[in-house]
Amino acid sequence: RERGATLIHISTDYVFGGDGNVPRREDDPVRPLGVYGRTKLAGEKAIAEAGCDALILRTAWLYSEFGNNFVKTMLRLTAQTPRVKVVFDQAGTPTYAADLAGAIHRMISSGAYRGNEGTYHFSNEGVCSWYDFAHEIAVLAGLDPARVIPCHSEEFPSPVERPRYSVLDKTKIKETFNLTIPYWRDALERCLERLGAQTAGTAI
């Protein structure tokens, strides 16, 4: 604030509860179910209380060709094991980190962020379950998609409660910054191409 800089804060779809089946808007009520969502929401509130200019970007199901993430885990498991169970009753939208970074770069480099500070949602376009995502990873990587088996969340008991529906409405960010957001399957294909896994069918 003292330097007149704009803060960029990456937040999460997990600030919302899991009820409903309508994409979440930026002004929808928040109700985080777990510690992760609560800490991210606390960060959003701290920024608001500080009174600094900020862009708060809520994203979801983030992955890339770098580090450890769901895509690389599914590539490894599907290549090495005969059956991989993945939940089909949690819906959201994957986000390719390169697309998120590209959107942020455009927002900053164009100068359009000035006067448009606030909270925005960004993920790739479309909706899928974790099972749909894992199945498509196998298909595009040249692995056997029949190894990916759908299951209920109850088959994976966990102390961490996750929202059953956390699709983000991206109308605001698209209209404010004139963004065209790629569909999640197209983004996944680009990531796999960069990993060199689309036709190789090898473990990562």
What feature does the model see in each segment?
Residues 2, 6, 15-57, 61-62:
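Catalytic helix-loop patch of NAD(P)-dependent Rossmann-fold dehydrogenases
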Residues 103, 110-159, 199-204:
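Mid/C-terminal beta-alpha module of Rossmann-like enzyme folds, strongest
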Residues 154-176, 181:
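A hydrophobic C-terminal alpha-helical subdomain
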